[in-house]
Structures are given as C-alpha cells and as structure tokens.
C-alpha cells in the first residue's frame, strides 16, 4: 500500500502489481487517526480540504485502470469525499473508525456472513462548500431553496458545483 498522507509513493507500484494479479481488489483509502505528522484526522489535526489526503486519488485511479472488480473500504473520522471514487467503483463500504473488532466485522460482511442493509445515517458532502450539512432541513440548508430570488440567485446555491451530495 501507500502512505495515506503526503507525497510519498513508496509501495504504490508493488501494491498495484499485487492488485493486478487479484480477482477482486479491496482498495483501502481514507484517513489515519492519531497524533503527529502522519495522521490525517484526530485531536488538533484540522483541515480545510475534504478530498482524500496524499496521493490516494492517484492510487485509486491507477487501481481503477486495472479493470478489476473493486470494493473500496473507506476509513475516516471526519468528512472525506472524492468524486472519482464515488463514481467509478463497484462498491464503497464506509468503515469509519472500526475499533478493536472492526476487522472481524468487516470480514463477516465481505465474506457474506453478515449483510449490511439500509443507508448511511449521514450525507456525504461533495465538497467543502456543502459543509456543514444541516440534517434537520429538507434541502440541506435554510438559505437555499428552488426558485430563491434573494441575494443568492443561483438556485443550487453554488456558482461552480451542484448542490447534490455524493
């Protein structure tokens, strides 16, 4: 694999070679919780960017180019979003921060012993401009509604992107 933050690509070529020989790719992406410079989420580690940290999108694009069935395992403890990943892979499993028994639970789901059902209890923002997400309002925010003719004349509320979540 690769380091989840920074520009280090060490291990990427080896990981892609292993993936090329696999029937199914389990692509683990997201953040790393903890303290210090290698962490991307945690106490005192703030970010203005909700895209995948480091070279992870590049890694995901190269894995996609292998044309293999791929299940994305998305680890994070804060909002992370990537439009390429959301629109190109066979399945995405939001793993959050799974804890001590997370690997056992994940294996049960991946091998069909458990069947996760339902929908995420949260909305995944497309970009940082959609944050914070207002869960109590039907259109996401009290400031934007279809046909609004006040100060914000763009009915989506954005001049450069859609208001639709991923």
Regions found by a protein language model. Give the residues of each.
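Hydrophobic helix-and-loop "lid/oligomerization" segment in the mid-to-C-terminal part
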Residues: 1-88
């Amino acid at each position: 694999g690769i380091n989840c933050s920074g520009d280090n690509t060490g291990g990427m070529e080896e990981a892609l070679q292993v993936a090329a020989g696999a029937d199914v790719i389990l692509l683990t992406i997201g953040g790393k919780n903890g303290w210090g410079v290698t962490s991307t989420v945690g106490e005192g580690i703030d970010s203005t960017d909700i895209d995948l940290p480091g070279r992870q999108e590049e890694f995901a694009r190269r894995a996609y180019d292998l044309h293999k069935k791929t299940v994305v395992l998305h680890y994070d403890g804060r909002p992370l979003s990537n439009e390429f990943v959301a629109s190109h892979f066979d399945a995405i499993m939001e793993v959050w921060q799974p804890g001590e028994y997370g690997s056992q639970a994940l294996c049960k789901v991946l091998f069909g012993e458990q069947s996760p059902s339902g929908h995420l209890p949260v909305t995944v923002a497309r970009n940082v401009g959609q944050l914070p997400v207002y869960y109590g309002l039907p259109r996401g925010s009290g400031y934007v509604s279809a046909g609004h003719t006040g100060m914000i004349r763009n009915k989506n509320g954005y001049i450069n992107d859609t208001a639709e979540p991923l």
